[in-house]
């Protein structure tokens, strides 16, 4: 083989790769769609992965510049950004069969071929099967059973807060709330029997998933997908990256529970005790997810088998652990901050708690009566949407949405920040913390305008558990304390993050109160 031939082949391969990346980078230019161009190969991915400036806020800035519909490229992905509520509703709900995939980084694996796929990443009939099985965990009956465990963790947190604030110190409530949510979800997703608050080593592993900087790794994986798959395969064997380290821990937890169940011949009570038991009850060695990938998702009345592979059991527990940790802690942190800087609103919440509970026990049935607290939580999530970067979809079949043609393979990213701060949708007081805007029972005029938990069939499955956790803890906290700002309180909050939008800290003073 001559040197000239080798050089010619090498040059042809290089030219082919270069042409491919230039085709992606110029995609929106050729379509006549406005948007930030970024750089060849990378697009705007490096900007979106900056920890110090959340991608959510960058989208808001670009929407002001380019309008409510524009396009960008991030690595090998072509992304259409949408900040129009009618289009959001069309994509998430009316045309769900054309947009049932989700925007993923290649390091998360191929959702159609990968064995280790959880509900967030799954698509098609595999997603439907996982969703059907998982939804049992969040029924009203299941939540009622969970209430006792959630409240036990809430009371344990109050004991730690009492110790830490005995001298009048201000504390970072974000850290305390993370301990609380990990304690709750650790009991449900890891089979933890007792509280491990402030002594659970897994907390730091999970914090690192959300707070650690993995910009270069994520960038390389998304720009060069084959490298992402290679790194994924390698890190499952040698888990060093926090997410894979946590997955490895979860594998050990599930294996231990399987061994326990085999010794005890099943769960003692004959019914699921936690998420692990629920998923293990559905475990089967005969799950064929490759067949699901071949099915036409638009088909109706196709039988959904309620079975999980062993890897899917681990994946579901892993997802529920990370999903239940960060977002609920962040929501509680934002509510606390907003109540501290708005004492009159805080007093209304306290009055409602006194009216509904007084000095009596916090009953599950009465949590639904905390209507004003509902409004406060909703408004906090409007002002500070959390994991809204997850409000994305993959176009599975070329279609037209409100006159905009979207080709198969294009990703759609909803600009939640712009939707939540649009004065045309919310009024000129859009930047104000105004819980009363939620006091009416009438549905929102614009159905795609509010996306704290997503929308449509892929809406966050753990939403009701998250709200219950917040209501129980806030009720106990505000029975005993008043949130006040101090010299360590950042006003306004400094927001950071990429996967989720987090405050750097939420220091407040908790003044004891007599009920």
UniProtKB/Swiss-Prot annotation:
Its cofactor is heme. It is an enzyme of class 1 (oxidoreductase). It holds the Pfam family p450. Keywords: Heme, Iron, Metal-binding, Monooxygenase, Oxidoreductase. PROSITE patterns: CYTOCHROME_P450. Heme binds at residue 460. Its EC number is 1.14.-.-. GO terms for molecular function: heme binding; iron ion binding; monooxygenase activity; oxidoreductase activity, acting on paired donors, with incorporation or reduction of molecular oxygen. InterPro entries: Cyt_P450, Cyt_P450_CS, Cyt_P450_E_grp-I, Cyt_P450_sf, Cytochrome_P450_3A. Belongs to the cytochrome P450 family. Cytochromes P450 are a group of heme-thiolate monooxygenases. They oxidize a variety of structurally unrelated compounds, including steroids, fatty acids, and xenobiotics. This is Putative cytochrome P450 CYP13A2. It comes from Caenorhabditis elegans. The gene is cyp-13A2.
């Amino acid at each position: 083989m001559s040197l000239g031939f080798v050089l010619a082949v090498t040059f042809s391969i290089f030219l082919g790769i270069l042409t491919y990346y230039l085709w992606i980078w110029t995609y929106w230019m050729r379509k006549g769609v406005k948007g930030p161009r970024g750089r060849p190969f990378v697009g705007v991915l490096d900007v979106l992965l900056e920890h110090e400036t959340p991608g959510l806020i960058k989208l808001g800035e670009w929407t002001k510049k380019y309008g409510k519909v524009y396009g960008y490229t991030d690595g090998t992905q072509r992304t259409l950004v949408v900040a129009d509520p009618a289009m959001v509703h069309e994509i998430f709900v009316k045309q769900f069969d054309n947009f049932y995939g989700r925007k993923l980084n290649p390091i998360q694996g191929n959702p159609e071929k990968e064995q280790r796929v959880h509900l967030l990443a799954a698509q098609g009939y595999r997603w439907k099967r996982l969703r059907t099985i998982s939804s049992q965990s969040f029924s009203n009956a299941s939540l009622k059973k969970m209430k006792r465990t959630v409240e036990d963790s809430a009371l344990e947190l109050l004991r730690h807060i009492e110790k830490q604030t005995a001298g009048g110190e201000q504390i970072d409530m974000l850290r305390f709330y993370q301990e609380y949510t990990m304690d709750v979800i650790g009991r449900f997703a890891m089979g933890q029997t007792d509280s491990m608050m402030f002594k659970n080593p897994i907390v730091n592993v999970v914090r690192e998933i959300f707070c650690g900087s993995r910009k270069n790794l994520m960038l390389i994986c998304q720009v060069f997908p084959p490298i992402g798959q290679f790194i994924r395969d390698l890190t499952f064997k040698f888990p060093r990256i926090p997410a894979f380290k946590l997955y490895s821990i979860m594998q050990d937890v599930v294996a231990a529970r399987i061994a326990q169940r085999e010794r005890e011949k099943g769960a003692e009570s004959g019914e699921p005790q936690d998420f692990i038991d629920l998923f293990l009850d559905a475990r089967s060695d005969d799950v064929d997810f490759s067949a699901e990938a071949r099915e036409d998702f638009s088909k109706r009345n196709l039988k959904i088998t309620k079975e999980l592979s062993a890897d899917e059991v681990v994946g579901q527990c892993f997802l529920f652990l990370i999903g239940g940790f960060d977002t609920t802690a962040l929501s509680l942190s934002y509510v606390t901050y907003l109540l501290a800087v708005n004492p009159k609103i805080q007093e209304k919440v306290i009055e409602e708690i006194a009216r509904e509970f007084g000095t009596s026990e916090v009953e599950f049935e009465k949590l639904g009566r905390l209507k004003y607290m509902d409004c406060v939580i909703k408004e906090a999530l409007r002002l500070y949407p959390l994991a809204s970067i997850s409000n994305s979809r993959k176009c599975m079949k070329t279609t037209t949405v409100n006159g905009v043609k979207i080709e198969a393979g294009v990703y759609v990213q909803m600009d939640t920040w712009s939707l939540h701060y649009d004065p045309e949708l919310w009024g000129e007081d859009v930047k104000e913390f105004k819980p009363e805007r939620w006091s009416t029972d009438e549905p929102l005029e614009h159905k795609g305008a509010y996306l704290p938990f997503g929308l449509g069939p892929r809406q966050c499955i753990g939403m009701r558990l998250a709200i219950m956790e917040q209501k129980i803890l806030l009720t106990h906290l505000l029975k005993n304390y008043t949130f006040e700002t101090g010299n360590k309180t950042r006003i306004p909050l400094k927001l950071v993050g990429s996967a989720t939008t987090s405050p750097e800290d939420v220091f407040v003073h908790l003044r004891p109160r007599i009920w």
